[in-house]
Amino acid sequence: MTSSSCPLLDLILSPADLKKLSISQLPGLAEEIRYRIISVLSQTGGHLSSNLGIVELTIALHYVFSSPKDKFIFDVGHQTYPHKLLTGRNNEGFDHIRNDNGLSGFTNPTESDHDLFFSGHAGTALSLALGMAQTTPLESRTHVIPILGDAAFSCGLTLEALNNISTDLSKFVVILNDNNMSISKNVGAMSRIFSRWLHHPATNKLTKQVEKWLAKIPRYGDSLAKHSRRLSQCVKNLFCPTPLFEQFGLAYVGPIDGHNVKKLIPILQSVRNLPFPILVHVCTTKGKGLDQAQNNPAKYHGVRANFNKRESAKHLPAIKPKPSFPDIFGQTLCELGEVSSRLHVVTPAMSIGSRLEGFKQKFPERFFDVGIAEGHAVTFSAGIAKAGNPVICSIYSTFLHRALDNVFHDVCMQDLPVIFAIDRAGLAYGDGRSHHGIYDMSFLRAMPQMIICQPRSQVVFQQLLYSSLHWSSPSAIRYPNIPAPHGDPLTGDPNFLRSPGNAETLSQGEDVLIIALGTLCFTALSIKHQLLAYGISATVVDPIFIKPFDNDLFSLLLMSHSKVITIEEHSIRGGLASEFNNFVATFNFKVDILNFAIPDTFLSHGSKEALTKSIGLDESSMTNRILTHFNFRSKKQTVGDVRV
């Protein structure tokens, strides 16, 4: 199949065009969609396994229902590439998905009326769907179809919604896309229930045996054997006496082969107009159609550009990539596990992304993956700390939002020394608005007792991790998913213990003070070099700790610096800028301040270069704004690639 040989897909400009195809043509369409996704993601990167697994189900849903009149609500939203291709987005935007000028990797209402919500977090679809369905008058109600993965049922929000379903709610069809995975392998009792009850080989085997036996009964056998759903349910009841979904008021159909579109369509047609809510259980295979993704769906959950070329080049000498901050975290965590025999690690379904597999393998009895349950992860960590054990709660910045009260009530109010390792702090680039880790300092700064810090380099990161085991209060170490600078302006022992609230001066100057957080310290040092061309000498300081703030050092520095710049990859509301500006106001310093941060808006997706330039956080833009703001310009010169 060549890049121009997607004849069926090319015909589809909207779901109405899909309905013009015969059912017999749909398997061929599924293959074309898979080819298109693999071809594009080979160039751009993106979510691969989940999208390959949901192709036939998406085709069947659009074939039976009528979007956007009927409302599709995808949980998480990263598995919507087939949905985008069937709703008029098989264009250049898809060619650049998750990249500059490309489509979002999640549902996005600004792209299409077929996308109802911005998405990115798990467990929200059922609540959103219920809110729409239960408040729309019956006479004007269209179908509402939430599409959830099995991992969503380990999320408390989904169970809360399940508990509120009304049994007389019509035109409400819940799709359970069951691939027995989220990103990493599912965990917990809910996963075990699905595995035992819905996937048990004996269930299908015994069902078929009973049907064959009944068919042999004279006169009534054929009639009895036709009642397959009732028979199937009876068999399932042998393994689970109280069927889960029916106890919550949902009729249940399934499990159904999610890759047999010819069977999916008549089943969806039969449940479409039932006067009560129903759950259709569809079994799919993550990574379907690509052997390496199907064999290792977690590895191919999200792929980088040129992943196919990397696979074919395995025989060549490997170019070892620079270790990222998560890589350093995973390595150091194993060292800490050796040093502290009581150290425990908790994560909400992010063991692979956060590089926790090494610790998990070495210390399985001290590792806990609690599933998509961020609130529980935090409060569970509080319990571990209360029992006298050191504990690190490893969590993405964007997912920590979901556990705000748990951090406040169960950790900070108790003054428990839980260590939050906040991964993916800063811009998320391709993942976009739902995943940017740029808000955590805003709410953590408001928490009494909380220590907040960010490393600029490998060695400082290791120092903070080792030091945090000695702190007696809750702490948050935030770090991005980028290569961790190996060199450091100040050399140091990785085992050096840091005290909270101590900043470091990286370079001395006289004319302007630059305070930069994290790896932006290196950008600040480069800006210092640019300013030297104008005869301007800058002092560069890494605060390291946002809370407690080093009031002593900054009071001393402001006695000799009247011009100050702050630089951070965080929202302008609540981060370094807010902390420093409040410090200046509190102690009544008379200084001219220029803050560089992320503006108070929702940022889209894109490359690092495009995003930082769009908000003026790239080196060239910052240098030129500094020259203008402080009137440092002398003669016309070129700074970087910008004429000033």
UniProtKB/Swiss-Prot annotation:
Catalytic activity from the UniProt record: D-glyceraldehyde 3-phosphate + pyruvate + H(+) = 1-deoxy-D-xylulose 5-phosphate + CO2
GO molecular function, one term: thiamine pyrophosphate binding
Cellular compartments per GO CC: cytosol
Keyword Magnesium part of the UniProt annotation: yes
GO biological process: 1-deoxy-D-xylulose 5-phosphate biosynthetic process; isopentenyl diphosphate biosynthetic process, methylerythritol 4-phosphate pathway; terpenoid biosynthetic process; thiamine biosynthetic process
Keyword Cytoplasm: no
One Pfam family this sequence matches: Transket_pyr
CDD domains noted in UniProt: TPP_DXS, TPP_PYR_DXS_TK_like
Family matches, as InterPro entries: Dxylulose-5-P_synthase, THDP-binding, Transketo_C/PFOR_II, Transketolase-like_Pyr-bd, Transketolase_C, Transketolase_CS
EC number annotated for this UniProt entry: 2.2.1.7
Record-linked SMART domains: Transket_pyr (SM00861)
Cofactor: Mg(2+); thiamine diphosphate
Note describing how the cofactor binds: Binds 1 Mg(2+) ion per subunit. Binds 1 thiamine pyrophosphate per subunit.
Subunit note: Homodimer.
NCBIfam families the record matches: dxs, PRK05444.2-2
Protein name: 1-deoxy-D-xylulose-5-phosphate synthase
